[in-house]
């Protein structure tokens, strides 16, 4: 059963329009909705996920014209790192807006992260974002970071690019990273999962109309069933160990559960967590309720183990770095 704190949090999510003195839960999104307006809203709400811990540094870099930044904890070399694919339906979001989220993973795992601003649709439809993602990984390799010292991580639309990049790297015979973590990855842009229908009302963060519009922006004239657009339909053999999260009540739940099943059938080491009563990308909300904190701890331990770091402290340990976030 979901914790009392998580249920209260979900209640606030569902009724947050009332806190803004609005009667309507949400505004419909269609092709007439200004994309920049949606992006501005994301940037304004970024602070909700927390601020950078003391001593963290943000170092901007340019990767063949792609804006990116290193997010580093104090006194940490770049020998091992996370490559983070930010979410936002492939249309909104940014590295800057995700600093608070990524900082939690960085703090808990003890390694830095490279976060990059891949090209967003509709200005940059497929394959621009995927090409930028491959370039970001190649940049890390060119910087001398070994593949076995890199873990991919992505949320929502960034989870899509995380898997699509793995497939592209495999096709190009580029060594794969040590592992990958996704939160509520959008793996099927055909939107055929049962949860896309059954959870349309229970999902308080993702909306079917928005997903359809974002899909059209990203795919352009391309078939949404192409494996590098919808990794669910790709050849998953040979992928590194995966740690996957989804909420039971979210629109994209089945995008994760179906990919997990197909990856296992392909012989991939998969750990799947479907949080009961949870919502889209719920681990990013740590430490606001127990389920998110537990997931965050598991993710950080996975990163440390894949990178052969010291095992992460058990939940509720006095050494738990999330206790100070």
Residue spans of the language-model regions?
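A glycine/proline-hinged amphipathic helix-loop "lid/cap" segment
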Residues: 1-71, 308-325
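Alpha/beta-hydrolase superfamily serine-hydrolase fold, recognizing
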Residues: 59-325
């Amino acid at each position: 059963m979901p914790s009392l704190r998580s249920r209260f949090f979900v209640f606030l999510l569902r009724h947050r329009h009332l806190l803004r003195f609005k009667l309507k839960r949400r505004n419909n999104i269609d092709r007439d909705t200004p994309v920049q307006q949606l992006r501005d809203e994301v940037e304004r709400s970024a602070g909700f996920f927390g601020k950078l811990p003391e001593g963290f540094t943000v170092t901007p870099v340019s990767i063949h014209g792609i804006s990116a930044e290193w997010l580093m904890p104090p006194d940490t070399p770049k020998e091992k790192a996370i490559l983070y694919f930010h979410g936002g339906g492939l249309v909104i979001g940014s590295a800057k807006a995700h600093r608070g989220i990524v900082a939690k993973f960085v703090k808990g795992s003890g390694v830095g992260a490279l976060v990059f601003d891949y090209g967003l649709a509709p200005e940059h439809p497929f394959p621009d974002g995927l090409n930028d993602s491959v370039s970001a990984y190649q940049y890390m390799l060119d910087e001398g970071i070994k593949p076995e010292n890199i873990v991919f991580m992505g949320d929502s639309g960034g989870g899509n690019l995380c898997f699509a990049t793995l497939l592209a790297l495999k096709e190009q015979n580029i060594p794969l990273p040590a592992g990958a973590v996704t939160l509520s990855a959008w793996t099927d842009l055909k939107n055929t999962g049962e949860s896309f229908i059954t959870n349309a009302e229970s999902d308080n963060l993702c909306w079917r109309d928005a997903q359809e519009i974002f899909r059209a922006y990203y795919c352009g004239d391309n078939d949404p069933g192409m494996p590098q657009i919808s990794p669910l339909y790709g050849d998953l053999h040979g992928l590194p160990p995966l740690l996957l999260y989804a909420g039971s009540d979210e629109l994209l739940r089945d995008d994760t559960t179906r990919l997990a099943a197909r990856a296992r059938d392909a012989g991939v080491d998969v750990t799947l967590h479907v949080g009961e009563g949870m919502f889209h990308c719920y681990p990013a909300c740590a430490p606001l309720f127990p389920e998110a904190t537990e997931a965050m701890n598991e993710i950080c331990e996975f990163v440390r183990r894949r990178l052969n770091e010291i095992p992460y402290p058990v939940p509720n340990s006095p050494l738990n770095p999330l206790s100070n976030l």
